[in-house]
């Protein structure tokens, strides 16, 4: 249910006591380190499913007048340096909103927010426009926005003053388009491999990709796959998203 995420990251006092009593110190350590000691979790409910922009707007009382990150869980990115770390480093240089993007192929543009960039230079690109899910023949580029954003608090102004669309939804893409009238927004082509875990096939690919690199069971799992006739398997160190 809705409390699953809260329960997962909550302190499990009874479980910790049980693991300690049984001397299962490795498991106890793993449970205790789910959340770093300097991190506090705050949860905000979206009372109605009124679009991604509305969900972001629900966080305004918590975020306030600070830059913040948006992470969409469907997009799992296998990267040696976590993509948000890459983007935070860039934010430290430009001090403006940043959208993670990747080339999605012309036929896939109708599944993404697509950006128009002002330069043809290397990433990061200054964004000149953004449109939600255009048909391939109308797409300004093939750079699609994926589920990692760093946004300045100015975005809340545009979310609050946006005219709701179909079904009363408030779209983040529309607010970003309006934000372009106030300040620069950058598109960042990240380093890493993205899996769209809203897709059944990509979900399975992600499980396989992470399993063969798992520090505990990776070697055994690769052996199992080899026994099934799979010969092209990775053996890289674990990556992070």
In which residue ranges do the predicted regions lie?
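N-terminal FAD cofactor-binding segment of flavoenzymes
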Residues: 1-23
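Short active-site-adjacent helix-start/loop capping segments
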Residues: 2-7, 51-52, 79, 196
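Conserved beta-loop-beta/alpha segment of the NTase-like Rossmann-fold superfamily
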Residues: 14-18, 25-117, 153, 159-162
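Low-complexity, flexible helical/coil segments
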Residues: 27-37, 78-82, 103-110, 137-138, ...
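Catalytic-core segments of class I nucleotidyltransferases/pyrophosphorylases
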Residues: 69, 88-92, 119-223
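Generic C-terminus detector
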Residues: 211-241
């Amino acid at each position: 249910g809705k409390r699953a995420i809260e329960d997962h990251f909550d302190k499990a006092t009874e479980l910790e006591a049980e693991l300690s009593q049984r001397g299962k110190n490795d498991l106890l350590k793993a449970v205790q380190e789910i959340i770093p000691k300097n991190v506090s979790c705050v949860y905000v409910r979206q009372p109605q499913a009124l679009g991604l922009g509305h969900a972001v707007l629900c966080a305004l009382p918590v975020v306030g007048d600070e830059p913040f990150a948006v992470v969409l869980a469907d997009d799992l990115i296998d990267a040696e340096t976590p993509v948000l770390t890459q983007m935070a480093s860039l934010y430290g240089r430009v001090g403006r909103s940043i959208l993670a993007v990747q080339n999605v192929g012309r036929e896939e543009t109708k599944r993404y927010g697509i950006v128009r960039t002002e330069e043809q230079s290397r990433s990061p690109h200054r964004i000149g426009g953004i449109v939600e899910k255009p048909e391939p023949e109308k797409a300004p580029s093939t750079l699609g926005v994926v589920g990692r954003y760093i946004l300045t608090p100015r975005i809340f102004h545009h979310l609050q003053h946006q005219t709701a669309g179909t079904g009363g939804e408030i779209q983040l893409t529309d607010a970003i388009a309006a934000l372009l009238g106030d300040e620069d927004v950058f598109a960042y082509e990240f380093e890493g491999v993205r899996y769209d875990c809203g897709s059944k096939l990509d979900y399975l690919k992600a499980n396989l990709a992470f399993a063969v690199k798992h520090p505990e069971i990776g070697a055994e799992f690769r052996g199992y796959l080899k026994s099934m006739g799979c010969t092209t398997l990775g053996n890289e160190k674990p990556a992070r998203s």
